[in-house]
Every structure is written in C-alpha cells, then in structure tokens.
C-alpha cells in the first residue's frame, strides 16, 4: 500500500510517524524547508507517552519524485489546498484515494448527498471549483481529526493527547478502500472508526470551531475564558444555534445539545484556539473553512445567520488588518 502524506506538519507528521514505525506501508511525505531537511537527515522523530522514537521516512520536496499513490492524505490547512493543486497532481493515479484532513466544511460536501444540492460547489472553500475539478470528489475519503499534536522542532513531533481519526465515505458506504486504510491505521496504534455519516461528525467538531475560533481571535481569550464570561458564552451559543439550524436542514444529526458542547469547550481549559494562535503568529487564518462556508450553507438552505454574519465581518476585517487573510 503506497501512502503519501502531503503536508507533514503536526497532524501529518504524527500520522506519518505512526505508520512508519509500524512499517507495514510504503510511506512517503511531502514537506519543505527546515522540516524536510531534518527528516531527510535524521528521520521523523516522535515523542509519545514520554518516549522518543525515530521513524525512517521517505521525504521529498516535490511530489514528482514519488509518483502515483494508492492513498494521498491531505494534511495541510484548507486555505492552502488550492495553491497546492499543481504539486498534488503527480500523486494522483487512476485509482488513487484522497483522504481530506482539513478542519471545517469540506470542498466535497455535496458529493453523493443526492437531492437538489447534489454536486454544488462551495465557493468559500473551493473558489471556482478548482479542487473539485482537479482532484475529483469521487476519490475522497472524509475524516475528522482529534489528536492534539505539536511540532517541537524541525523533524520532531510531540503527541499531546488523542489518537482518533474518524474516516468515512461521502456516500456512507463501508467500501474496501476505507476499510483497508482504517485497518492499517489501527495496526499502527491509532483509532480509526469508519463512520456511515461522516458529515454529521464533521459538523459536531465544526460546531465549536465556527464560534469559539473567531471569538477567541477577536478577544484574545482562551476557551475557558470565553465560556466563563456570560456575554461571550451567549454569543457563541447563538452562533451555534444558527449553525445547528443549517446543519439539521441538511440532514445532519447532532448527538449532543448545544450547552453540553459549550461545557466541553470550557473543560478544555486555558487553551488558545488555532485561529488565535495563527493571528498572534501572523499566519493565514482558517476563516473561510470554519465560518464563511457555514454562512454560504445558510444561504443555500435559506436559514438566517445574523450573528455568524456579524462575527465573520469582524474577524475577517481584523485578519485583513493583520495580514492574516486576503
């Protein structure tokens, strides 16, 4: 089984290290800069459960060096996907499956859903439908990523908690390709449940991200602080209820209530969201996949999003001023 991880940051690096240590797959990664140089020189190092391991990994700067794969795991952020299409193309053969590990609403959301929205492209995450055309939704295996992982230094990945990567076909079927991939991930020491409704699981994670991420960026607050404050907690709750109405109109099942989801966010503690961290570091922010796409879905199903609209306008303006959004 030939697998390439495209985007070997924290999550991509962790998955690559686990698969490489297991030694059951023909594994490669596409990386760049100091990270690539460190991996080529010293292997990919992983700190997990207090112990450090070294995984010998084939690392390349260009996908042309690797050729067509059985699976390509896209572990880069959603806004980085369109600019990377030319680099990804050499990895795609006639039977290559593509595993999407981005946060937020996926570009393939309306593939295989049936009904009047079947085949709808979402401009917020796939401007002009370029990803849909170049990669093709028929290749996709969806996923929801839960591990907390950090890059401590070039070539050094530190696992904090969590080992679950939920997988699912857009159609909901338990196909051979998703089953085989899940088996390899489990044998590598990961949890890889195969879901028959991956969209609903995507929504449950998105539910918190679309509210807490922009509020955190706007206020400079941690999850615990947002939940502890009556005003920001109410703001997050209103955004989540607007999103829930959109999701349910699309057939999404929310297995928990909004207040339980908010409590879960608060229990994470003094954690800065990824959007706040990106703002502080001057990096591009995941505004479109986490928030703009939900607004776009609301328009498609005729559900009002006044609170989401207001928060989106504010966080987008802030990001533009800081050079973190264009």
Curated annotation (Swiss-Prot):
Top EC group: oxidoreductase
GO biological process: pantothenate biosynthetic process
Active site: 205 (proton donor)
Binding annotation for substrate: 103, 209, 213, 274
Keyword Cytoplasm on entry: yes
Keywords per UniProt: Cytoplasm, NADP, Oxidoreductase, Pantothenate biosynthesis
Predominant place of localization: cytoplasm
Compartments (UniProt record): Cytoplasm
Reactions performed catalytically: (R)-pantoate + NADP(+) = 2-dehydropantoate + NADPH + H(+)
GO MF assignments: 2-dehydropantoate 2-reductase activity
Binding site for NADP(+): 7-12, 103, 286
Gene3D superfamilies registered for this protein in UniProt: N-(1-d-carboxylethyl)-l-norvaline Dehydrogenase, domain 2, NAD(P)-binding Rossmann-like Domain
Biological role stated in the UniProt entry: Catalyzes the NADPH-dependent reduction of ketopantoate into pantoic acid.
NCBIfam families, per the entry: PRK06522.1-4 (NF005089)
Similarity comment: family membership: Belongs to the ketopantoate reductase family.
Name by which UniProt lists this protein: 2-dehydropantoate 2-reductase
């Amino acid at each position: 089984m030939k697998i390439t991880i495209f985007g070997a940051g924290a999550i991509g690096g962790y998955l690559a290290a686990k698969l490489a240590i297991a030694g059951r797959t023909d594994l490669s990664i596409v990386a760049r800069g100091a990270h690539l140089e460190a991996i080529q020189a010293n292997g990919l190092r992983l700190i997990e459960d207090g112990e450090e391991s070294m995984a010998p990994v084939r690392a390349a700067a260009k996908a042309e060096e690797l050729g067509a794969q059985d699976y390509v795991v896209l572990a880069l952020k959603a806004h980085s996907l369109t600019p990377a299409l030319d680099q990804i193309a050499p990895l795609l053969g006639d039977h290559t499956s593509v595993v999407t590990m981005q946060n937020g609403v996926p570009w393939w959301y309306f593939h295989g859903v049936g009904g009047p929205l079947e085949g709808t492209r979402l401009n917020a995450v796939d401007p002009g439908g370029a990803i849909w055309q170049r990669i093709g939704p028929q290749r996709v295996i969806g996923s929801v990523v839960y591990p907390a992982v950090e890059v401590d230094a070039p070539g050094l990945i530190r696992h904090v908690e969590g080992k679950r990567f939920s997988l699912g076909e857009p159609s909901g079927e338990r196909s051979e390709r998703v089953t085989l991939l899940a088996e390899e991930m489990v044998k590598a020491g990961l949890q890889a449940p195969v879901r028959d409704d991956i969209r609903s699981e995507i929504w449950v994670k998105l539910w918190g991200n679309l509210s807490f991420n922009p509020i955190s960026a706007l206020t400079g607050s941690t999850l615990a602080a947002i939940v502890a404050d009556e005003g920001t907690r109410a703001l997050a709750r209103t955004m989540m209820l607007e999103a829930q109405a959109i999701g349910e109109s699309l057939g999404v099942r929310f297995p928990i209530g909004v207040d339980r989801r908010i409590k879960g966010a608060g229990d994470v503690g003094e954690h800065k969201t990824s959007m706040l961290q990106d703002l502080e570091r001057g990096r591009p922010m995941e505004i479109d996949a986490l928030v703009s796409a939900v607004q776009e879905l609301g328009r498609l199903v005729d559900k009002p999003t006044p609170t989401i609209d207001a928060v989106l306008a504010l966080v987008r303006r802030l990001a533009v001023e800081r050079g973190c959004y264009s």
